[in-house]
């Protein structure tokens, strides 16, 4: 696995072991890091990543980043996975692959008041790649990416694709507003 390559304005920082990219991204954002920081942990059994944004809008408008990142993930996995793999999104950030829960997106922001402008917003991705135990059927409502026929999808390539597809979604939202995102979401 090689170090991921990101589009301009995005820069990656790898963490290893038990380090939580979401927590690190939130700490870096609170310290005033640049928007576009991608903190990631490419473990053998899990893809953990977080992206720092500086939305310059109030919280209730900035929360559009969660569905933008979700659609970005769906498009990224859809481009890399076999065509028969179904990826569905849940409003709370949950990800489903072939009908079973397979990871989640989560969000944190510098403010909790929906009417306050944000200094930063972080969206995190937690995606199980490989089953933790020897009995994957033990929890039939949960799955992992590789258990669903995606063993050829490399974590670094998926991370790169997620950031790229998310950037396309952000640019589209910036240019056209939320209507295209609503259309994309309904199509999923």
Regions found by a protein language model. Give the residues of each.
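A short acidic, often aromatic-flanked loop/helix-cap motif at beta-alpha or helix-coil junctions
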Residues: 48, 95, 153
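A structural signal for short, well-ordered beta-strand segments
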Residues: 49-51, 93, 123-127
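Primarily the active-site beta-strand->alpha-helix module of PP2C/PPM metal-dependent phosphatases
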Residues: 39-54, 59, 67
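Catalytic palm active-site di-aspartate
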Residues: 87-99
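Short, ordered beta-strand-loop transition motifs
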Residues: 40-43, 88-90, 114-115
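Long, positively charged amphipathic alpha-helical accessory segments at protein N-termini or as interdomain linkers
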Residues: 1-35, 58-64, 68-82, 101-188
């Amino acid at each position: 696995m090689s170090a991921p390559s990101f589009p301009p304005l995005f820069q990656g920082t790898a963490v290893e072991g038990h380090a939580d990219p979401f927590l690190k991204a939130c700490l870096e954002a609170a310290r005033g890091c640049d928007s576009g920081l991608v903190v990631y942990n490419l473990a053998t059994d899990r893809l953990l990543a977080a992206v720092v944004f500086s939305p310059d809008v109030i919280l209730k408008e900035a929360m559009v980043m969660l569905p933008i990142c979700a659609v970005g993930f769906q498009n990224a996995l859809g481009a890399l996975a076999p065509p028969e793999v179904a990826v569905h999104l849940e409003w709370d950030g949950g990800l489903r692959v072939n009908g079973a829960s397979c990871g989640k997106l989560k969000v944190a922001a510098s403010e909790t008041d929906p009417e306050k402008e944000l200094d930063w917003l972080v969206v995190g991705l937690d995606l199980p790649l490989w089953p933790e135990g020897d009995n994957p059927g033990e929890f039939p409502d949960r799955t992992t990416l590789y258990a669903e026929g995606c063993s050829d999808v490399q974590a670094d390539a998926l991370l790169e694709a997620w950031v790229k597809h998310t950037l396309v979604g952000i640019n589209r939202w910036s240019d056209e507003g939320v209507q295209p995102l609503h259309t994309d979401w309904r199509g999923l």
